[in-house]
């Protein structure tokens, strides 16, 4: 899909080669998102349409996971032309079912892709726990609590990514805030004697980024289909991007980074990074992001979904089709979602619009999820699930690269959603920070 540009009197916006349906909802401010008022903007109906939002379904949370839900088997290899569901199904026949509880502040869920069927759950204070056969193993996979600063809400052990060849390399990467308030991207190796234990002494720090404040520190890590490691960093915090990091190409803050961890001393720069030779820091792949807490790649198409936490009014989901050139500018802090926020952008600036936004009447902190590519519920194929930390709402979005895109509110869970995850079979999970639980989407019995 070739992006096209939409121009108003002084700005150029980039969007997909189609109209972009956006859900625009009435707003009220919730404290977690920040402090300030986003001004309004009138958007052309030929460019932006406003679909009706169906009433959400209240998700029923039974006390145990039904035995009818088997342990997942690995997902088939990706295809270039995946089969997607034609429309979002009626959510009333589904619920988020508890898999395990007893976690302490879970913030990330990952699988190792090694055929073991395990899930790895990050606890904010600095531990990685293993979920195997729907049971939480008593001994942590990794415990680095002594290295992690988790005193503040948005700091701690924040992200995990396994090397694409983890089954043979045993390498994995974490994103955490250390005791000096610095973002650390570190590499570890699994223990040579126990696949359920990492070797703490194997830590090698590959990147440090100084954080000016204790919020908007990002946290997400993911390997792309190109084999490179993508790192999401927020604007560094306080509120309203006081240091104007969003548009500053001489800082790694407020950026999506992309590095090659298989070459170089600690890493090398992919040659097609937009500033690999000049114009900005070479690690930068995209910029203008306020706090890309969670992002993920569609395993079948390679498309990238970025959930960017807003300031006071709008939460957004950004979409980057596979093959899109690097160097996109997502607009912060000139724009919050699709709405002017502060300062006057230079003439002829190109921004990439979100494909979905919701107002603070529906939540206050977006938690990005995954595209469903499992086999047990084919009716959800191709659906991107994401939610909100404050409201517990869960949305679904299908066909983002096509003219018949649909997005709607599916569930009101009451959970404090920090993250989503998928197992090796592509089945989807979410974490409830408040209850210390991991839940899985399944049909009601």
Briefly describe each language-model feature range.
Residues 185-193, 245-261, 320-321:
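Beta-propeller blade signature
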Residues 239-251, 268, 325:
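Acidic/polar, solvent-exposed loop segments in beta-strand-rich repeat domains
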Residues 1-16:
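N-terminal secretory signal peptides that target proteins for export/translocation
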Residues 404-424:
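Conserved blade-ending motifs and adjacent loop-strand segments that build the rim/top face
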Residues 32-34:
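C-terminal motif of bacterial Sec signal peptides marking the signal peptidase cleavage site
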Residues 36-65:
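Short, low-complexity, disordered segments immediately C-terminal to signal peptides
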Residues 38-41, 66, 70, 74-240, ...:
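Acidic, Gly/Ser/Thr-rich repeat motifs that build Ca2+-stabilized beta-propeller blades
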Residues 139-153, 201-218, 262-285, 330-362:
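Surface-exposed loop and turn segments in beta-propeller and other repeat-based domains
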């Amino acid at each position: 899909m070739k992006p096209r540009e939409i121009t108003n009197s002084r700005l150029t916006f980039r969007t997909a080669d189609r109209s972009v349906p956006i859900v625009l909802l009435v707003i009220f401010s919730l404290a977690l998102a920040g402090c300030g008022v986003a001004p309004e903007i009138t958007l052309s109906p030929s460019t932006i349409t406003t679909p009706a939002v169906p009433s959400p379904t209240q998700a029923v949370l039974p006390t145990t996971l039904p035995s009818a839900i088997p342990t997942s088997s690995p997902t088939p290899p990706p295809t270039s032309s995946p089969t997607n569901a034609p429309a979002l199904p009626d959510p009333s026949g589904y619920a988020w079912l508890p898999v395990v509880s007893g976690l302490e502040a879970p913030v990330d869920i990952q699988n190792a892709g090694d055929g073991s069927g395990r899930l790895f759950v990050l606890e904010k204070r600095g531990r990685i726990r293993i979920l195997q056969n729907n049971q939480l193993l008593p001994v942590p996979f990794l415990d680095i609590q002594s290295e992690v600063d988790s005193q503040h809400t948005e700091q701690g052990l924040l992200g995990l990514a396994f090397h694409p060849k983890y089954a043979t390399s045993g390498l994995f990467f974490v994103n955490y805030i250390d005791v000096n308030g610095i973002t650390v991207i570190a590499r570890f190796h699994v223990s040579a004697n126990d696949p359920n234990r990492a070797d703490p002494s194997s830590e090698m720090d590959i990147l440090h980024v100084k954080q000016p404040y204790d919020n908007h520190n990002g946290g997400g890590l993911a390997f792309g289909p190109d084999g490179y490691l993508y790192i999401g960093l927020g604007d560094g915090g306080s509120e309203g991007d006081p240091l104007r990091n969003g548009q500053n190409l001489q800082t790694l803050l407020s950026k999506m980074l992309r590095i090659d961890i298989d070459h170089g001393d600690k890493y090398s720069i992919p040659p097609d990074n937009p500033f690999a030779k000049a114009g900005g820091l070479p690690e930068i792949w995209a910029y203008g992001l306020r706090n890309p807490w969670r992002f993920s790649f569609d395993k079948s198409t390679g498309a990238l979904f970025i959930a960017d936490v807003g300031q006071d009014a709008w939460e957004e989901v950004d979409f980057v089709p596979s093959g899109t050139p690097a160097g996109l500018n997502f607009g912060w802090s000139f724009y919050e979602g699709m709405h002017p926020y502060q300062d006057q952008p230079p003439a002829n600036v190109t921004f990439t619009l979100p494909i979905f936004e919701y107002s603070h009447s529906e939540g206050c902190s977006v938690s990005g999820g995954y595209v469903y590519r499992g086999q047990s519920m084919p009716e959800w194929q191709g659906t991107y699930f994401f939610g909100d930390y404050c409201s517990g709402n869960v949305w679904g979005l299908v066909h983002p690269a096509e003219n018949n895109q649909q997005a709607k509110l599916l569930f009101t869970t009451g959970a404090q959603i920090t993250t989503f995850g998928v197992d090796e079979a592509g089945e989807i999970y979410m974490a409830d920070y408040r209850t210390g639980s991991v839940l899985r989407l399944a049909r009601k019995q």
